[in-house]
Amino acid sequence: MAASSPPRAGELLAEARRAFREEFGAEPELAVSAPGRVNLIGEHTDYNQGLVLPMALELVTVLVGSPRADGLVSLLTTSEDADEPRRLQFPLPTAQRSLEPGTPRWANYVKGVIQHYPAAPLPGFSAVVVSSVPLGGGLSSSASLEVATYTFLQQLCPDSGSVAARAQVCQQAEHSFAGVPCGIMDQLIALLGQEGHALLIDCRSLETSLVPLSEPKLAVLITNSNVRHSLGSSEYPLRRRQCEEVARALGKESLREVQLEELEAGRELVSKEGFRRARHVVGEIRRTAQAAAALCRGDYRAFGRLMVESHHSLRDDYEVSCPELDQLVEAALSAPGVYGSRMTGGGFGGCTVTLLEASFTSQVMQHIQEQYSGTATFYLSQAADGAKVLHW
């Protein structure tokens, strides 16, 4: 059985150029790409100032375009999963008139980055967006689009900010224009991904360190449950609030500062549900540090065990899994050659990530598909590079 073979960046670039020529009657002058990501471990820890261990994917968003002199932004997406309309036009923001989120929802990510972009003067532009990152699959199609937009704007009007500052602009765009109070992980990995490496991110200090992930005998399998979720209207903001409430009750700025022993000692100060939410986060931060160390020393069995512990904690304490994700994880763990498997992303649908011996890949996919009550889509990805300017 074969994994889905999404188009490579070169094919997406050709599609984007073709669509741009059809829409705007000229060849685009600029092209950029930014990847999706899979988080290997460290779930729902980023907005708690914890540790995360994502890798950038070969699934990317490509944005091509050209500046224009009339102060307008004209956008087109070729994504069939994006909400209508697929094309729209709006004026650049001014001191008197800010951009506002609206419909289509996909364009809000672009608008948000434009609104918060720190350099000036920004010209109007025409652009086409093409992406192989599945929408709502927990692989961060949103940050991929935000970072692609930011990288494109840099070509039109260079900025002088740090990588962390760029990530924060994209994060702010998601907060204010998509209504999702996300952490900074997705934007940082989309900017800083490096081929053959995962990236350990400290979401408190924003320090990053590369963790080797290029062992040829190893495979990272992403399984999409094809259950769609929309985080903005779901339980995500509630989980964030619960974590903040527990930290406050314990007199801490964030759950990053809380040890498991302190949480146990302060159990009476928080609700039962709040305790479970915090127990997940505090344990997950510890697991992520242990997992990065295991990967560095090539101990894939230890890494796999930590992945499974993470899934159980997300299912039982954080309660963001769902029957489909649990089914996919159980199926993977009952297949040969699998080190570990867990849900990844915000939850309530989306994807699982499985670490396995590469030689068992076809067998494992076949087994999962047979065991799963829905229809799964598989992606095999190497750890890839972050955002880049494309040339042809």
UniProtKB/Swiss-Prot annotation:
Which molecular function GO terms apply here?
A: ATP binding; galactokinase activity; galactose binding
NCBIfam families per record: gal_kin (TIGR00131)
Provide the Gene Ontology terms for cellular component: cytoplasm; cytosol
Biological pathway = Carbohydrate metabolism; galactose metabolism
**According to its UniProt record, which protein family does this protein belong to?**
Belongs to the GHMP kinase family. GalK subfamily.
Entry function: Catalyzes the transfer of a phosphate from ATP to alpha-D-galactose and participates in the first committed step in the catabolism of galactose.
Task: Cite the record's note on assembly.
Answer: Homodimer.
Q: Which residues form the active site?
A: 186
Recorded hits in InterPro entries, A to Z, give: Galactokinase, Galactokinase_CS, GalKase_N, GHMP_kinase_C_dom, GHMP_kinase_C_sf, GHMP_kinase_N_dom, GHMP_knse_ATP-bd_CS, Mevalonate/galactokinase
At which positions is ATP bound? Answer: 136, 138, 140-141
Pfam families named among the record's database cross-references: GalKase_gal_bdg (PF10509), GHMP_kinases_C (PF08544), GHMP_kinases_N (PF00288)
Residues annotated as binding alpha-D-galactose: 37, 43-44, 46, 186, 236
Annotated GO biological processes are: galactose metabolic process
What's this protein's name?
Galactokinase
Q: Which EC number applies?
A: 2.7.1.6
Enzyme kind, highest EC tier = transferase
Gene, per the UniProt record: GALK1
